[in-house]
C-alpha cells in the first residue's frame, strides 16, 4: 500500500513534507494527540462523545483493512501537521512580540534623545 503524504509551503519560503512512518505507533491509531477535547475540558468533567471508533480490521482480526490503515495514517499525519503549524504560530507570535518590544524601546530612546525624561506621568 502506498503511504499518504502531505506538502506544506508558505509565502515565506518554508516548505515541509509529511509522511507516516511504517510501524510507528503514532500512525497505527485513530486517537490523535492533537484532536478531541483538551485535558482541561476532560478534567472539568466533560465526556468525549466524539471519540473516534477503532480502525476496522479484517474478518479474522489479524490486521487492519485498507481503509482502517488509511484512517490511522491520516490521524498521525493530522497530528504532525497540527504540531508543526502550532509551532509556526508560536514563532510568529514571538516574532510579533519581539517587534513590538523593539518598537517600544526605540520610541523610549527617541523620546529621551528629544529631551524627555521618560516620566510623562509625573506631575
From Swiss-Prot:
It is found in: Nucleus; Chromosome, Telomere. Keywords: Activator, Chromosome, Nucleus, Telomere, Transcription, Transcription regulation, tRNA processing. Residues 1-63 are annotated as: Disordered. Its main location: nucleus. It comes from the Eukaryota. InterPro entries: EKC/KEOPS_Gon7. GO terms for biological process: cell wall mannoprotein biosynthetic process; maintenance of translational fidelity; positive regulation of transcription by RNA polymerase II; telomere maintenance; telomere maintenance via recombination; tRNA threonylcarbamoyladenosine modification. Induction: Accumulates in response to hyperosmostic conditions. Signal peptide: none annotated. Component of the EKC/KEOPS complex that is required for the formation of a threonylcarbamoyl group on adenosine at position 37 (t(6)A37) in tRNAs that read codons beginning with adenine. The complex is probably involved in the transfer of the threonylcarbamoyl moiety of threonylcarbamoyl-AMP (TC-AMP) to the N6 group of A37. GON7 likely plays a supporting role to the catalytic subunit KAE1 in the complex. The EKC/KEOPS complex also promotes both telomere uncapping and telomere elongation. The complex is required for efficient recruitment of transcriptional coactivators. This is EKC/KEOPS complex subunit GON7. It comes from Saccharomyces cerevisiae (strain ATCC 204508 / S288c).
Amino acid at each position: 500500500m502506498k503511504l499518504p503524504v502531505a506538502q506544506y509551503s508558505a509565502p515565506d519560503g518554508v516548505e515541509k513534507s509529511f509522511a507516516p512512518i511504517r510501524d510507528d505507533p503514532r500512525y497505527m491509531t485513530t486517537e490523535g494527540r492533537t484532536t478531541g477535547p483538551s485535558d482541561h475540558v476532560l478534567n472539568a468533567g466533560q465526556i468525549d462523545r466524539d471519540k473516534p471508533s477503532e480502525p476496522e480490521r479484517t474478518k479474522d482480526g489479524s490486521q487492519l483493512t485498507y481503509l482502517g490503515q488509511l484512517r490511522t495514517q491520516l490521524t498521525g499525519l493530522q497530528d504532525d501537521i497540527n504540531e508543526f503549524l502550532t509551532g509556526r504560530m508560536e514563532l510568529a507570535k514571538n516574532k510579533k512580540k519581539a517587534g513590538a518590544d523593539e518598537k517600544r524601546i526605540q520610541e523610549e530612546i527617541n523620546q529621551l534623545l528629544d529631551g524627555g525624561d521618560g516620566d510623562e506621568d509625573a506631575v
